[in-house]
Amino acid sequence: MNVKNQIILALDVEEKNKAYEILDQTTEYLDTIKIGYPITLALGPSIITSIKEEYDVKIIADFKVADIDATNEKIVKTTLNYGADAIIVHGFTGEDSVLACKNMAEKLDKEIFLLTEMSHPGADKFLKPVSLDIAQMGVDLGIKNYVAPATKIDRLKKIREVVGKDSFIISPGVGFQGGNAKDTLQYSNAAIVGRSIYNASNPKKALEEIIESIKV
């Protein structure tokens, strides 16, 4: 997956008007949007289709799929059929659950991103001890796309070492959570930014400043 300007917008708002206002200001510089539960639960999964049709962007559904294999397969199928280009899945559920997601996505000519470790402090207790194992499982299963934290550069570096230089990593946590876009992109292919853009008084300017900071 190619990502324009190496920035993915995490559109974690709940109102359609606000979402469209932000997209109106930012899609000149962005071509990839991450949509999660806040907007999907508020407006229904058809919002994926609407945004896809209105703005012609790539959409990553951040649903952190984490169930048994049969249920995962249904979640992935339904989500991708609404128009998402990819879906994020948890790795801690194990090989069978992850493989169900991968196989369904491939059947629909779409992609999955395997979540190795999360960006918030609480992830250190349970996910951190197994994140490299999750990454290695992904490699063994032939997965090419991963999620790894921008807030923990040392962990991001280690995950990159496991998955290899040809894998595609996207990293949440840039901005409000403390991650730095330029530092993140030493090891990641794209930085995910949410509140620093959608909560800004001028989202377009905020995005421009982030893009400029990468180039410096």
From Swiss-Prot:
EC number: 4.1.1.23
Binding site for substrate: 12, 34, 62-71, 119, 172-182, 194-195
Residues at the active site: K64
Biochemical pathway: Pyrimidine metabolism; UMP biosynthesis via de novo pathway; UMP from orotate: step 2/2
CDD domains associated with the record: OMP_decarboxylase_like (cd04725)
GO terms under cellular component: cytosol
Gene3D superfamilies per the UniProt record, alphabetical: Aldolase class I
GO molecular function, one term: orotidine-5'-phosphate decarboxylase activity
Reaction(s) catalysed (UniProt annotation): orotidine 5'-phosphate + H(+) = UMP + CO2
This protein's record includes keyword Transport: no
Highest taxon of source: Archaea
Key words, A-Z: Decarboxylase, Lyase, Pyrimidine biosynthesis
Signal peptide: none
Membrane-spanning residues: none
Cross-referenced Pfam families: OMPdecase (PF00215)
Example of a GO biological process term: 'de novo' UMP biosynthetic process
Cross-referenced PANTHER family: OROTIDINE 5'-PHOSPHATE DECARBOXYLASE
Main function: Catalyzes the decarboxylation of orotidine 5'-monophosphate (OMP) to uridine 5'-monophosphate (UMP).
Assembly notes: Homodimer.
NCBIfam families reported for this sequence: PRK13813.1, pyrF
UniProt name for this protein: Orotidine 5'-phosphate decarboxylase
Classification lineage: Archaea, Methanobacteriati, Methanobacteriota, Methanomada group, Methanobacteria
The gene coding this protein: pyrF
